[in-house]
């Protein structure tokens, strides 16, 4: 079920909470609102003020506003005797009864396997079945399309509903359940579809939980030799987890109501502000994280590893459901980029470059025309963290990889004798001391007197160079610290001889879980802070103090204080050695000291009173504590503060000696040193093709032609003498060449009786060897010829008109009437590469080809440097901007919200969120200018002007290695060398 609560304006995405308000629920469709507006609806209801306050108003994607009737929760509907029961309730209860009866009837030897299969079936129905339905509904409104196509919610008296019995049953079912403020005939199709979807969800969720409990009962037992104290402790802990799980579910339902519980925003949105409190202040995704604590409580009470393993599997499947289904929908629905601010630019003064000839270095050529970048915070284009950011051309990555290989080699080739174990533990301890004390000292000095930055400024470097070197130092220190700890843990670990002995298996499971928790915590911290915050950027760059709490920081002030070291204690559980306990205690103590002595003073100095005292989890716990425990909490805080104050005073007194030693050490040390997706071949022959004349089918194309020089790029000096000149062609013989990324209009004709499920797809010419049957999937690059013909609205995007009667004359001079239509392929329905393509008209939803368009070519023309004076930098850059702007607009789908209208206008926010746009641009730049950029460069530059400057700069730097003709000086000859 959907576990997202609703926020009133605080970071809706980073913590998984859906921010639902009036602004977020605007119509998604492009058409105008055909129903009465929300204001009109409110005016109708304002006669009864007390009543109106209790009402919730929903809004469908096409803008229709309706009153959302109150509904009851699933358990009350099914199990409460006071609630009216209908056929679906009786059916669900009967299925649950069959599960319980099956447990009683099956023999004990077969019971565990049977209920394991039953539970996995219902769990797959939940995560895969419901997940697929919600995914299709989110992307193509498939469930609503099914309902509209079948007309099951249309009154049979209109003659449009072919299922009157089903209509009567659904009407009785839903109106029995919702007796207040609900009319089956007046409710929107989206709402009725959601109600039917709810009944399916009720069945799956109830059977999922029931089968899990029955599986636990089948596996339950008492371990041999277990003492009464362990039995009581096991059941007490298990029941506590189950009760906590129950509270999480109830509190979550109190906050999100049935609307979010049953994924209502996949169907419609509500117009109201909703609160953010309770369990949603305690943990991110509480329904999917702490909301599964009961599974582990039941596993503990059952004392069965089988129940524990199947609980872990179910929990992992639930997280996959969250990542693959819910999060993309949340991003699309509630995290819509804000409208871009338009900036009026004076076209007469937008280019004010120095037009003097460039006789000096590259830096002097471009100094006056460099783009204005924000100086407060460095733009991150080449990140360090993550496997996908590894760059073997970068010295930091080379050092890190070589060090890891060295550690791996030493760990594997050396024996695990006490001497080597001591050396590895000592090495891990020294690295941890350096990582906390050494790095902490550098950051403390940087915070107080900019020591690190001053060192680089002394040698003429900039603060950005100091920042770059600091990131490398910190990254290397961090990786070495954890590599040394892992090596020490490996040396101290001994493979268990008997996994069933004692708590060996449980220790490994808990240890692996703690390691996974630390990995997730570190990932969440990085997603919240970014590269700048991860490397303590506010110690190096003074920016306006604006502190925001997003992601994991909404729940914890310092997640690294506990959760950030969970993996260290996980290694302790797995190895069960005193040496690892020592390393874990040392790591935890030094981390707490680092936070208290380095981070906290700097944060107080930088942000002052804007620092938050208590995080969401602490606030929730304090509200639930009795007054006596609150007083104890205050006393503990006072003791800790006094202890850290004593440590600070001690370090302050010893600082001169420490500084002298560190400076000497630094001086002495510095003196020494990317798919191819699987193609599904589908060949479905239609038996009734004999009734159609292929001459009545046709496809014609209209698109944006590229510039004239691009048309003649085929001709070069590589051919024979007779082939160097291009033939003059026109009309049907003219080569069709369209711009990269430009929309293509397709006009089609078909017989008047053509199938309403016909469709047109875009393919590479070389993809299909047959002209009669298409053998490869279109991968989403297709549009239906008629509306409401398929169970998705995605295939209708780009459809302009259909079934317009047109009189044409055949080749045999016979005039006939045909159906015609138009559609536009753009954005994701295009191929974002160069090549030769064709459109294919297909019959009746199958892959039988009725018509094929003329082949056309998508080509990116190379920038002609000969058209401008290479010595005039201003003219070159202006020409690059002029050539680049339309290409960037095409790459951004010509969307006015993200595509710039001028070279100075910044890109829309969606470019930073969706990497496909920047990847399109770098592909085009590489083919236009012969320069390969990373996608991060496009996002960092922010507009065409800055990107053009970067291209010109790169062309100058790479001029000696250019493979194209240049007006500049050539390589020096022997005569010049002499």
Curated annotation (Swiss-Prot):
Keywords: Endoplasmic reticulum, Lipid biosynthesis, Lipid metabolism, Membrane, Methyltransferase, Phospholipid biosynthesis, Phospholipid metabolism, S-adenosyl-L-methionine, Transferase, Transmembrane, Transmembrane helix. It is a multi-pass membrane protein. Residues 1-15, 703-713 have a biased composition (Polar residues). It is found in: Endoplasmic reticulum membrane. PROSITE patterns: SAM_CHO2. The chain crosses the membrane at residues 90-110, 114-134, 200-220, 228-248, 282-302, 305-325, 400-420, 422-442, 474-493, 499-519, 565-585. The gene is CHO2. Pfam families: PEMT. Its EC number is 2.1.1.17. Belongs to the class VI-like SAM-binding methyltransferase superfamily. CHO2 family. This is Phosphatidylethanolamine N-methyltransferase. Residues 111-113, 221-227, 303-304, 421, 494-498, 586-978 are cytoplasmic. GO terms for molecular function: phosphatidylethanolamine N-methyltransferase activity. Catalyzes the first step of the methylation pathway of phosphatidylcholine biosynthesis, the SAM-dependent methylation of phosphatidylethanolamine (PE) to phosphatidylmonomethylethanolamine (PMME). It comes from Ajellomyces capsulatus (strain G186AR / H82 / ATCC MYA-2454 / RMSCC 2432). It catalyses: a 1,2-diacyl-sn-glycero-3-phosphoethanolamine + S-adenosyl-L-methionine = a 1,2-diacyl-sn-glycero-3-phospho-N-methylethanolamine + S-adenosyl-L-homocysteine + H(+). Residues 1-63, 703-724 are annotated as: Disordered. It comes from the Eukaryota. Residues 714-724 have a biased composition (Basic and acidic residues). GO terms for biological process: methylation; phosphatidylcholine biosynthetic process. The lineage of its organism: Eukaryota, Fungi, Dikarya, Ascomycota, Pezizomycotina. The keyword Repressor does not apply. One of its GO terms (cellular component) is endoplasmic reticulum membrane. Gene3D superfamilies: 2.60.40.2840. Residues 1-89, 135-199, 249-281, 326-399, 443-473, 520-564 are lumenal.
């Amino acid at each position: 079920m959907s576990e997202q609560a609703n926020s009133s304006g605080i970071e809706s995405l980073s913590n998984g909470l859906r921010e639902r308000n009036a602004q977020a629920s605007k119509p998604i469709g492009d058409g105008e609102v055909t129903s009465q507006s929300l204001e009109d609806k409110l005016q109708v209801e304002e006669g009864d003020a007390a009543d109106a306050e209790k009402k919730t108003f929903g809004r469908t994607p096409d803008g229709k506003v309706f009153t959302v009737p109150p509904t009851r929760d699933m358990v009350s509907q099914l199990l409460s005797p006071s609630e009216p029961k209908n056929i679906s309730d009786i059916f669900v209860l009967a299925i649950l009864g069959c599960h319980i009866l099956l447990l009683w009837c099956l023999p004990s030897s077969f019971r565990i396997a049977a209920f394991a299969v039953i539970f996995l079936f219902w769990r797959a129905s939940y995560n895969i079945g419901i997940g697929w339905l919600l995914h299709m509904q989110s992307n193509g409104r498939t469930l609503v399309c099914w309902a509209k196509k079948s007309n099951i919610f249309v009154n049979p008296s209109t003659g449009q509903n072919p299922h009157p019995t089903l209509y009567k049953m659904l009407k009785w079912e839903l109106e029995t359940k919702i007796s207040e403020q609900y009319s089956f005939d007046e409710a929107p199709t989206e709402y009725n579809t959601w109600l039917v979807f709810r009944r399916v969800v009720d069945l799956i969720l109830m059977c999922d939980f029931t089968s899990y409990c029955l599986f636990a009962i089948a596996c339950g037992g008492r371990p041999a030799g277990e003492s009464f104290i362990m039995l009581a402790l096991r059941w007490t802990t298990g029941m506590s987890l189950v009760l906590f799980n129950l509270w999480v579910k109830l509190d979550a339902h109190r906050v999100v109501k049935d609307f979010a519980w049953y994924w209502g925003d996949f169907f419609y949105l509500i117009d109201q502000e909703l609160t953010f409190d309770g369990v949603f202040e305690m943990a991110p995704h509480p329904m999917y994280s702490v909301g599964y604590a009961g599974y582990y409580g039941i596993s503990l009470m059952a004392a069965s590893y089988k129940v524990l393993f199947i609980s872990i599997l179910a929990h992992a499947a639930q997280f996959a459901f969250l990542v693959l289904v819910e999060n993309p929908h949340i991003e699309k629905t509630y995290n819509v980029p804000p409208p871009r601010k338009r900036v009026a630019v004076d076209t007469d003064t937008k280019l004010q470059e120095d037009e003097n000839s460039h006789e000096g270095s590259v830096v002097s050529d471009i100094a006056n025309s460099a783009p204005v970048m924000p100086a407060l915070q460095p733009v991150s284009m080449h990140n360090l963290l993550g496997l996908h950011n590894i760059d073997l051309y970068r010295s930091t990555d080379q050092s890190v990889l070589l060090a890891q290989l060295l550690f791996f080699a030493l760990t594997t080739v050396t024996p695990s004798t006490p001497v080597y174990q001591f050396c590895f533990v000592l090495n891990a301890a020294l690295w941890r001391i350096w990582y906390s004390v050494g790095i902490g000292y550098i950051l403390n000095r940087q915070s107080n007197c900019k020591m690190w930055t001053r060192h680089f400024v002394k040698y003429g470097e900039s603060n950005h160079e100091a920042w770059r070197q600091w990131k490398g130092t910190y990254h290397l220190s961090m990786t070495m610290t954890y590599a040394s700890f892992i090596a020490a843990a490996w040396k101290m670990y001994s493979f268990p001889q008997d996994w069933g002995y004692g708590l060996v298996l449980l220790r490994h499971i808990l240890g692996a879980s703690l390691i996974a928790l630390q990995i997730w915590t570190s990932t969440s911290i990085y997603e919240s802070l970014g590269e700048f915050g991860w490397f303590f950027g506010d110690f190096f760059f003074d920016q306006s103090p604006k502190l925001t709490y997003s992601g994991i920081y909404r729940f914890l002030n310092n997640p690294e204080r506990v959760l950030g070291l969970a993996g260290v204690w996980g290694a302790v559980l797995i190895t069960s050695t005193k040496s690892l306990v020592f390393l874990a205690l040392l790591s935890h103590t030094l981390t707490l000291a680092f936070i208290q002595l380095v981070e906290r003073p700097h944060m107080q100095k930088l942000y002052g009173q804007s620092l938050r005292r208590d995080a969401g989890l602490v606030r929730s716990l304090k509200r639930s504590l009795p007054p006596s425990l609150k007083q104890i909490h205050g006393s503990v805080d006072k003791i800790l503060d006094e202890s850290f104050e004593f440590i600070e005073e001690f370090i302050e007194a010893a600082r001169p000696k420490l500084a002298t030693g560190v400076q000497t050490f630094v001086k002495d040390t510095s003196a020494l040193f990317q798919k191819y997706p699987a193609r599904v071949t589908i060949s479905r022959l239609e038996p009734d093709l004999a009734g159609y004349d292929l001459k009545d089918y046709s496809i014609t194309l209209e698109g944006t032609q590229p510039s004239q020089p691009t048309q003649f790029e085929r001709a070069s000096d590589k051919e024979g003498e007779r082939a160097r000149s291009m033939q003059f062609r026109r009309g049907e013989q003219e080569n069709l060449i369209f711009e990269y990324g430009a929309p293509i209009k397709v006009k089609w004709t078909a017989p008047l009786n053509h199938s309403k499920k016909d469709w047109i797809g875009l393919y590479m010419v070389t993809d299909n060897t047959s002209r009669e049957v298409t053998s490869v999937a279109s991968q989403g690059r297709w549009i239906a010829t008629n509306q409401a013909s398929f169970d998705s609205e995605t295939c209708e995007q780009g459809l302009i008109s259909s079934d317009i009667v047109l009189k044409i004359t055949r080749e045999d001079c016979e005039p006939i009437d045909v159906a015609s239509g138009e559609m536009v392929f753009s954005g994701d329905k295009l191929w974002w590469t160069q090549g030769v393509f064709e459109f294919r008209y297909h019959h009746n939803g199958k892959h039988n080809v009725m018509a094929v368009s003329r082949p056309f070519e998508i080509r990116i023309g190379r920038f002609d440097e000969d058209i401008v004076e290479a010595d005039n930098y201003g003219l070159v850059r202006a020409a690059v901007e002029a050539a680049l702007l339309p290409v960037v607009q095409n790459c951004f789908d010509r969307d006015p919200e993200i595509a710039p209208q001028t070279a100075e206008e910044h890109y829309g926010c969606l470019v930073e969120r969706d990497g496909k746009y920047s990847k399109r641009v770098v592909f085009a730049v590489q083919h236009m200018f012969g320069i390969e950029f990373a996608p991060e460069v496009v996002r960092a530059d922010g507009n065409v002007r800055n990107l053009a400057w970067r291209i010109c700069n790169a062309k100058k730097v790479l001029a000696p290695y250019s493979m194209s003709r240049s007006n500049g000086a050539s390589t020096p000859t022997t005569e010049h060398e002499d």
